[in-house]
């Protein structure tokens, strides 16, 4: 789960990959103004040596013990947190590794990570999935529905097409077209910004929601959207590719 802090935007950074980080409303800018990508360096971790903790193992529900695995639900389109390997079927990423590590501490064989549209994950907890580690931001509304635990602190960043051809200004988003993933913190955040625009008598943000973040990146790079808004490690990883 992610904990987010609102901060100030950073400056434009160009990349060779078709899109560029344009701002980061949730983290302070780095010294050179670029989005931090150090978090994207290690995409997998060998959890096989992790041992069960007896005190925790004793608390595991019998139904999960019987299954022998922890069922994790995730939107597997959010690299480097969760995405498919080149075979197109094997999930990987730091959220996937975390689920497997937790399972081993619980005395299980490991975790399985199954894809689900992000907005459907929380309603599926307790029935289809035992747990979800899928880039969630902890919010008061979500805590009314499920128990949430923070294990990583990230920011949120805008990204634009290389060279910022539409002159997107992250400090003035009124009247722009922004792609965001359904059900995310970023969807709520850009909606808040859009409402602020209309309250000031300016044009609303044209919000373009999608189930997959990867679909949004393609549209930003091709010029269909002015920008996208996503977790900063996701923006950083996309730029590196």
Give residue ranges: language-model regions.
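Acidic, polar ligand-binding/catalytic clefts
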Residues: 111-171
């Amino acid at each position: 789960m992610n904990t987010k802090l609102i901060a100030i935007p950073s400056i434009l950074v160009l990349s060779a990959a078709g899109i560029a980080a344009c701002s980061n409303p949730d983290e302070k800018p780095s010294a050179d103004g670029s989005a931090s990508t150090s978090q994207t360096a290690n995409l997998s971790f060998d959890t096989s040596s992790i041992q069960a903790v007896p005190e925790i193992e004793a608390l595991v529900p019998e139904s999960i013990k019987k299954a022998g695995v922890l069922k994790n639900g995730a939107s597997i389109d959010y690299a480097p947190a969760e995405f498919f390997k080149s075979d197109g079927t094997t999930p990987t990423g730091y959220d996937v590794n975390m689920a497997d590590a937790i399972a081993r501490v619980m005395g299980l064989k490991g975790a399985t990570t199954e894809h689900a549209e992000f907005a459907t994950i929380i309603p599926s907890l307790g029935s289809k999935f035992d747990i979800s580690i899928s880039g969630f931001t902890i919010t008061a509304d979500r805590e009314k529905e499920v128990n949430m635990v923070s294990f990583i602190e990230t920011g949120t960043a805008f990204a634009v097409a290389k060279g910022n051809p539409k002159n997107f200004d992250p400090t003035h988003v009124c009247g722009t077209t922004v792609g965001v993933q359904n059900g995310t913190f970023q969807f709520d955040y850009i909606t808040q910004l859009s409402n602020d625009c209309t309250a000031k008598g300016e044009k609303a943000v044209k919000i373009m929601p999608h189930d997959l973040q990867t679909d949004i990146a393609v549209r930003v790079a091709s010029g269909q959207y002015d920008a996208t808004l996503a977790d900063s490690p996701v923006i950083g990883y996309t730029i590196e590719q």
